[in-house]
């Protein structure tokens, strides 16, 4: 009987150590998430989505209404006047960059100059966003972030927006 009691006491003690360790892990995770939250707020502040008092600004309200794509990038492009001089067909093609997620094995360069220029601007803005995120101590790989905007459907969407059928495009 004393042996069983000792084993039971050891089990209870180990159980309490497990609970303590889990609590320490949860506390550490909370601190890590809090640090990440602070970094993300820093990014939002730098781009003017929130002010110093962390009050949501117009840019952030617009970003909240964007339901697909990279909200930060699209809001920045919108407020920087990126879409102002584009035709509706170009806008449709450009927006495909933000929703197309497939990786293409064959990547040829864009043949249309009127699409290549906006794509370069998107990639340039993506580099700026990635650099600000890195400066704000977020773990963002600049090249991976830029490559996450897949342009492979741009020409197809452009032709479709100009009235061609998918049968004619493919």
Residue ranges and their predicted role:
Residues 1-170:
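Non-catalytic terminal extensions of ATP-dependent helicases
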């Amino acid at each position: 009987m004393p042996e069983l009691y000792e084993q039971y006491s050891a089990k209870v003690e180990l159980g309490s150590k497990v609970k303590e360790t889990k609590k320490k892990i949860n506390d550490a995770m909370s601190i890590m998430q809090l640090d990440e939250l602070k970094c993300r707020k820093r990014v939002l502040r730098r781009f003017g989505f929130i002010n110093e008092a962390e009050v949501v600004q117009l840019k952030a309200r617009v970003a909240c209404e964007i339901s697909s794509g990279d909200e930060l990038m699209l809001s920045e492009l919108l407020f920087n006047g990126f879409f102002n001089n584009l035709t509706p067909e170009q806008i449709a093609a450009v927006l495909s960059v933000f929703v197309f997620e497939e990786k293409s094995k064959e990547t040829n360069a864009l043949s249309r100059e009127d699409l290549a220029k906006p794509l370069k601007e998107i990639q340039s803005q993506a580099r700026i966003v990635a650099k600000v995120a890195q400066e704000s101590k977020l773990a963002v790989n600049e090249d991976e972030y830029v490559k996450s905007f897949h342009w492979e459907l741009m020409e197809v969407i452009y032709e479709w927006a100009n009235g061609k059928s998918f049968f004619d495009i493919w």
